[in-house]
Design a protein with these regions (language model features):
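Extracellular/periplasmic helix-exit of transmembrane alpha-helices
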Residues: 62-74, 234-235, 256-285
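Flexible loop linkers connecting adjacent transmembrane helices
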Residues: 2-5, 39-41, 66-90, 118-129, ...
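Membrane-interface loop-to-helix entry segments
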Residues: 145, 153-184, 371-372, 376, ...
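Transmembrane alpha-helical segments of multi-pass small-molecule transport proteins
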Residues: 125-155, 171-178, 334-353, 376-385
């Protein structure tokens, strides 16, 4: 009987994620409703054709998490503080990054809250049909309740509290999407073919759709906020240079879990939507196609996953602006400060834009994920310079393998940014 609790798969997953540490925030930043939306649109419209983009994004995310984590442990400095201190024009670069990342993440938050509130309300309508027709007020009230609870937790919380809450959300999310994968398993050959790089053609003739979707996948997976925030979360965890192996394992497991969870979502979308030519127009379209296969159970599973993905992203995104500003100022994050509480409060108000305006959260989410790509080359270039400085890194200076990984990440980010710009210009 003593071993029974340890045989519980949910508890095992919880303990595994708790052991990951700062990487849990990387999963929170990366897999939100924006990621879910991008993966479902990719899987439903193009099958597994864009799996290569997800794989490369996760591979390069691992490289960049390793680089930023190593820099933090060796120097004791945070990212933007290091840029300001050691790079020529470092202050200008840092300010540009703060503006770009905060704007992109706040836009993501707008879509995330809209999708999460829609998902909850539309699921409630399934069981209480009398609420149909009250969507605007239902979604708005739901959004207000969600963001109020989150802000209250931020007001009273600490790193350890946030980490444990994120672990719970990510546990539910991971299990939900993994179970959904087995409900609609795609063909193995389609998965293998998806590892061959290609940009899909859109049958209806819309220009730039394929490039825009690739940029959205990369934008949500290789989020600049993930790498910039890593040094401060490592600081919050209390790790030192003695934890170098822990940091490396943390980065590796975070990247692996991001690939498995995101890949499962894409595969489910392919199995449920692709062959029937169903297009995702609203939040519940994501779960409707699973109902004939597994009934209401499928809706419940996927709903829990989508909601957990959204809520796991709200915490880190609310924190990103005060985190980056504190990073730039002195490299320290005080979660009890007036500045932290004020800026997170402003983010909460901004997040209500989609529910108040009654906008389509799916379309808003895809566009905002693309915005996250454009500051990424700056973020990669900065760490490439710093981690190769002998006077800063000593024996932990980047070796050939890490340097190749960072350079390839930079080339990949520039390529995706270029294609994202072209796609947006073609749609104007």
């Amino acid at each position: 009987m003593e071993n029974q609790p340890n045989s519980n798969p949910l508890r095992k997953l919880y303990l595994l994620l708790l052991a990951i540490g700062p990487g849990i925030f990387a999963i929170g930043y990366t897999i939100g409703t924006g990621s879910v939306t991008s993966m479902i649109v990719a899987g439903s419209e193009h099958g597994m054709q864009l799996l290569w983009g997800l794989f490369l994004s996760c591979l390069f995310s691992w490289v960049l998490m390793e680089a930023y984590g190593r820099y933090a442990l060796v120097t004791g400095e945070s990212a933007l503080f290091g840029f300001k201190k050691h790079l020529k024009f470092g202050s200008a670069i840092s300010i540009l990054i703060i503006i770009g990342v905060s704007f992109g993440q706040w836009n993501s938050l707008i879509g995330i809250l809209g999708i999460s509130a829609n998902a909850i309300f539309e699921t409630i309508v399934l069981f209480i049909p009398a609420l149909e027709g009250y969507e605007y007020w239902g979604v708005l009230i739901t959004a207000l309740i969600i963001i109020s609870i989150m802000y209250t937790m931020l007001w009273h919380g600490s790193y350890t509290v946030f980490e444990r809450i994120l672990v719970i959300f990510v546990s539910f999310m991971g299990l939900s999407f993994f179970l959904s994968f087995f409900i609609a398993i795609p063909d193995a050959s389609a998965i293998l073919n998806g590892m061959i790089p290609s940009i899909p053609e859109v049958e209806n003739g819309e220009k730039g759709e394929g490039q825009l979707l690739v940029a959205a996948i990369v934008g949500t997976t290789m989020a600049a906020a993930t790498f910039l925030s890593r040094p401060l979360f490592i600081q919050g965890k209390g790790w030192t240079i003695e934890n170098m192996k822990d940091q490396s394992k943390d980065a590796r497991w975070a990247a692996i879990l991001i690939f498995i969870i995101s890949g499962s979502i894409m595969a489910v979308a392919m199995g449920a939507f692709y062959h029937d030519g169903v297009k995702v127009e609203r939040v519940l379209d994501m779960v409707d196609a699973l109902e004939p296969i597994a009934g209401r159970f499928a809706i419940a599973i996927f709903f829990i996953g989508t909601l957990s993905a959204g809520l796991s992203s709200v915490f880190p995104i609310l924190m990103i602006c005060p985190l980056l500003i504190a990073d730039y100022q002195d490299g320290k994050l005080d979660m009890k400060s007036k500045q932290f509480k004020t800026l997170t409060g402003i983010a909460c108000l901004i997040s209500l834009i989609v529910p108040v305006m009654g906008a389509n959260p799916i379309k808003a989410q895809l566009v905002t994920q693309v915005l996250n790509v454009f500051v990424l080359p700056l973020v990669i270039f900065g760490i490439l310079v710093l981690i190769n400085r002998k006077e800063l890194m000593g024996k932990y200076k980047a070796g050939p393998v890490l340097n190749i990984g960072i350079v390839l990440s930079l080339i990949f980010a520039c390529f995706i940014s270029y294609n994202g710009v072209l796609a947006i210009l073609e749609k104007l």
